[in-house]
Amino acid sequence: MDIAQAKEILKEDLPFHAIVDFADQVVQEMNLSKNGKILDVGTGEGNMAITLALNGYRVITGEPEDDYSDYSKKDWAGKANKLHVDQLITFKPFNAENMPFENGMFDTIFLFCCLHHMQEAVRADVMKECIRTTTRAGIICFFEPTKAALELIRKAAPDHPDAADPVLYTQGFNLSEERRNSDLFIAYIFKKRD
């Protein structure tokens, strides 16, 4: 199934429509190996994991087991099932600041609009864990909302936190950085350097 078909099936799902084209564009530009190991931190509504699965990637995704926020209660599995990509997505509960994965396990890690929901005190630890669990040539990709996106979000959720800048947590690590921008999101793509 392609992105256009998925959008038609999920035509009532406004968050999916808001992110899928840009997320898909970024994934396409990254030219990831179809056999690569991919982690999606912060499942939420499942939009990032589903976008990856629609592109044929197998994905591990997860949230903290003790997360009772509105985002963690979303039926991402039902959405993935509707799109027939549920078999490509494995859910595993975990905390991003202390991941239960081996060193160098993942080729690519995605964090779609979740860093700004994490406490400031753990964000540096989250970055360290992403670096620890990616391969030597690993890629870590954060998506964060723009001011325009926050204005839209805050119409329904006035207390929604400000976007986070993942660059602040890269100090001391040998990473290259690229950015991709859309009206609603910024993708920060960090690549490990030897």
Q: Which residues does each PLM region occupy?
A:
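Conserved Class I S-adenosyl-L-methionine
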Residues: 152-175
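Class I SAM-dependent methyltransferase SAM/SAH-binding core
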Residues: 47, 51-98
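A short glycine-rich, Lys/Arg-flanked "PGG" loop and its adjoining helix->strand segment in the class I
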Residues: 124-136
